[in-house]
Amino acid sequence: MKEENLKLAAANLGEGVTFKGLMSKKAHLKNGVAKEAKDIPGWDYVVKEAAGGVCYSYYAAQPPLIGMTRPVVIKCPLGVRAFDTYKIDFKEAINIFHKLDCGDAFTEMALYYVLYPGVNEPHWYIRSVTGCTVVIGADSGKVMDPVHRE
């Protein structure tokens, strides 16, 4: 899956600007909690510019909704790497989440590629209303052991 929003955001910054890749993607949830894909009206993106390595943050609505904010320069986040593609979209990640015994709703959903030895794909991180954090491989669909927090 390629993020089409990257092209739109780069176009907002001027001619010739391209982004190296996605650094993170965090869901905005209706009323702070979600059960399904329709409960996500948009996303906060952090992307890295190809030429200078500068990072930008912006919001983009989830289609069929429209709209996005102008990208603003931010400090690049530490501990994550840029990536261009992934196979498991957020709808499929939500379906995988519902197959687990971690509650029926979630309060956070994010996608990023942790810069850590042995991590070879980006991951979806979904925090359930029961306090369980589900980690799903964004290429493999593999579920890591859920992490329970109090």
Segments from the language model and where they lie:
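Long, terminal "pre-/pro-" and other extracytoplasmic accessory regions
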Residues: 1-150
